[in-house]
Structures are given as C-alpha cells and as structure tokens.
Amino acid sequence: MRRIAFFPGSFDPITKGHEDIVRRALPMFDKIIVAIGVNSSKNEMFHLEQRQNWIEKTFSDCPSVEVINYKGLTIDACKKHQAKFILRGLRNSNDYEYEKSIAMMNQAMEPSIETIYLNTHPEWAAISSTIVRDIIKNKGNAQPFLASGVQL
C-alpha cells in the first residue's frame, strides 16, 4: 500500500513555510498531494489558477508531489484520493491546539486516516499567508517569505 499524504490549505499565497513542510515530508511518503481547499465564503487575494500554478512551479522538481483543488470536507477528499495521512505544519502551540481539534474530528469521521504534524523550521515559524497578504496589500516586499515558485 502506498503512503499518500494530503497537505490541505488555501495557500493564498504559498509560503516558504509551506514549501519547507512538504520538502521535509517527501522522504516519509510515496506521494504528497498539495490540496487547495476551495471555500466560496472566503475572499482570496489570488485566483485558484494562480495559486495552483505557483504550487506546481514550486514543486516541479518533485515527481511525487501532486497539486489538486477540492471542495467540501478534507476527510472526504482524503478518501477520494486514497490518502491515509493528513500532513500539517505547526508554528506554535496555538496552531497545535487548533489542529488537534480538527484532527480529532477527522479521526471520529474516518479512523483510518492519521494526522501527521511537522514542526515548522524556526526560520519560517513567524510566516503566515495572512501576514504575507498584509505585506503585499501595503506594498511591501513579500518575496523573501514566498515559496520558490512564486514571483509577484
């Protein structure tokens, strides 16, 4: 059985922290699906196609990374794509408490799917897509915080 991990997020935009988590997880899994969740009630800064293109460029050197988008529950998308693991990055204890609650609900809905946490590298722990969007909105230079495939 292949070890398939599902790495969900809005990736609006994808950051160095996201990229670092996926690259560090590559040796652990046969395949990592970077999955852009489509949420119609969320106002994204960047169109879905743009985000998907950036993620594909970022991981163009990684044949075991697949980029998709999905609607609905993450756990349902995991089942659809035969992923037995949900990959999450943790920047701090607040992230852990939030992610733990979601993982417990996912476990209740589908006990065969495990959530795997990787601590964010300290260099990227202060970065979030929200902060990066704020830098961009205020015409600052966000490039140092963006994944390698992103050019603004």
In which residue ranges do the predicted regions lie?
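Nucleotidyltransferase catalytic core that binds NTPs
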Residues: 1-152
